[in-house]
């Protein structure tokens, strides 16, 4: 069952996945996975894990914590082989227990398998119940185990056919890296909701949630895994097959607003440039008088720079970030979360005192963090604070791998822009429109899931019905 958790004023990414098949014996695949996961740490901070295959079996290690907290040289030294996969997790389905950390490992008729998953299934409970009625026993509460169990049950037909069978049954988002004793497989859901890319370093191949992880291990970007594609890497090289896909892909638009690292390129779109363009479009037609544009570090800085470039208002630093403080959303009580905001961010008093500020952030979820930041800037002597958001108001929950508040907790679901402005204490508030946000990622040929903004989900979260399917 999906666990309902108290979270802070951010939409948080669920997971990051990484895999490498080394043809070069000089490559230490456990170390490569470590550095790849470190580059993807922004996608999950609750747990980390690595599984390694040596042609005979699979060894793995996973635990709660950040990548450098989970792994040391001794642990990595014990993970020997020529293929590895890794995972960083932020739970959206299932609890935080170490048993839910990934990769998950299972033994089936063709040997051991390990699986790492970024995404979320909307029919996981129904599938789990059906399999339990058939006698299946589940060890975890995560939907990843449902996927792995479906593959294992059909594995006697061949691993690729088992994957195809799984893809016919599950509904939701998934970017998967699957490890067998002699192969690495990358799988992307038919809508391509979650990102997955392919890279190459020498004669070895790499799979990762974002291209920044390829850079971290010295791999060259080859291409993105396509929606509905199954990429198989083994001793014969790389080959792929596809399942039937919808008429439109639906990549998560919020990847470009907040989740992805700015140095990544996803489905041909430069994340940093898309954020700068969002800031520029946010400034068009905005006639507010101000002395300085500042951004909330780190995800809103590119948009703030874009706003400054378009408006002609000078860009400056107004907030300092303590990078050694845990994220505010992990605090269980509202009072502790608000204390966490003050500990994590602090106003640069000399920079903001007496100034009329344009404060740019990427999104507002509950509004509590925005209110604290506005209050902080006013306490530091800011004369005016005009908040500008480089995305539309978040009106609906995400069902496809992002941890969001419920509809009732989303401030944009029940309050107008004017009411939100009063709640956060800003002098004015403006959101980027959805058409303008879509223009920041235009030209790639991609289409996007915009459900959190307008309710247009590619899959019905209640029934699992898929849209845009040819009869």
Regions found by a protein language model. Give the residues of each.
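PRPP-dependent phosphoribosyltransferase catalytic core
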Residues: 167, 182-183, 200, 218-224, ...
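Short, glycine/charge-rich flexible loops or terminal/linker lids adjacent to PRPP-binding catalytic cores
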Residues: 312-358, 368, 395-401, 405
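Flexible loop/turn segments at secondary-structure boundaries
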Residues: 92-93, 123, 193-194, 214-215, ...
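Conserved short alpha-helical segments that host acidic/polar catalytic motifs at enzyme active sites
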Residues: 2-227, 232-290, 296, 384, ...
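A conserved beta-strand->alpha-helix junction
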Residues: 71, 140, 145, 315-326, ...
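Extended, hydrophobic alpha-helical segments in both membrane/secreted and soluble proteins
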Residues: 293, 300-307, 311, 315, ...
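Secondary-structure transition/capping motifs at alpha-helix termini
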Residues: 136, 156-157, 287-290, 309-316, ...
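Mobile, glycine- and charge-enriched loop segments
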Residues: 346-360, 364, 389, 461-462, ...
């Amino acid at each position: 069952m999906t666990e309902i958790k108290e979270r802070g004023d951010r939409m948080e990414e669920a997971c990051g996945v990484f895999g490498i098949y080394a043809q070069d014996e000089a490559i230490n695949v456990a170390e490569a996975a470590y550095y790849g996961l470190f580059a993807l740490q922004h996608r999950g901070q609750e747990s980390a894990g690595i599984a390694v295959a040596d042609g005979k079996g699979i060894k793995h290690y996973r635990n709660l914590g950040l990548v450098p907290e989970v792994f040391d040289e001794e642990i990595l030294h014990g993970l020997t082989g020529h293929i590895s996969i890794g995972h960083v997790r932020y739970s959206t389905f299932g609890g935080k227990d170490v048993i839910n950390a990934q990769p998950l490992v299972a033994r089936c008729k063709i040997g051991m398998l390990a699986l790492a998953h970024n995404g979320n299934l909307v029919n996981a409970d129904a599938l789990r119940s059906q399999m339990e009625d058939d006698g299946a026993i589940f060890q975890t509460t995560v939907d990843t185990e449902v996927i792995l169990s479906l593959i294992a049950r059909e594995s006697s037909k061949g691993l690729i056919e088992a994957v195809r069978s799984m893809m016919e049954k599950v509904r939701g988002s998934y970017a998967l890296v699957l490890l067998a004793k002699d192969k690495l497989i990358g799988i992307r859901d038919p809508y391509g909701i979650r990102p997955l890319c392919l890279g190459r370093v020498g004669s070895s191949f790499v799979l990762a949630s974002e291209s920044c992880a390829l850079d971290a291990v010295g791999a060259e970007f080859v291409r993105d895994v396509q929606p509905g594609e199954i990429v198989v890497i083994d001793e014969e090289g790389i080959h792929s097959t596809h399942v039937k896909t919808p008429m439109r892909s639906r990549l998560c638009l919020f990847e470009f607003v907040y989740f992805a690292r700015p140095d990544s390129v996803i489905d041909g779109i430069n994340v940093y440039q898309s954020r700068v363009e969002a800031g520029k479009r946010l400034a068009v037609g905005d006639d507010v008088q101000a002395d300085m544009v500042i951004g909330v570090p780190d995800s809103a800085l590119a948009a703030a720079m874009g706003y400054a470039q378009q408006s002609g208002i000078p860009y400056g630093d107004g907030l300092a970030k303590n990078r050694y403080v845990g994220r505010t959303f992990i605090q269980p009580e509202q009072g502790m979360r608000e204390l966490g905001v003050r500990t994590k961010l602090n106003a640069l008093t000399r920079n903001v005192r007496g100034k009329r500020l344009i404060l740019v952030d990427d999104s507002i979820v509950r509004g509590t963090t925005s209110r604290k930041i506005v209050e902080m800037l006013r306490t530091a002597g800011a004369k005016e604070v005009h908040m500008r958001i480089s995305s539309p108001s978040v009106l609906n929950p995400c069902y496809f791998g992002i941890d969001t508040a419920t509809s009732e907790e989303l401030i944009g679901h029940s309050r107008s822009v004017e009411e939100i402005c009063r709640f956060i204490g800003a002098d004015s508030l403006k959101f980027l429109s959805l058409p303008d946000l879509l223009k920041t990622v235009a030209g790639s040929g991609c289409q996007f899931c915009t459900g959190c903004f307008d309710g247009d989900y590619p899959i019905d979260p209640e029934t699992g019905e898929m849209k845009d399917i040819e009869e």
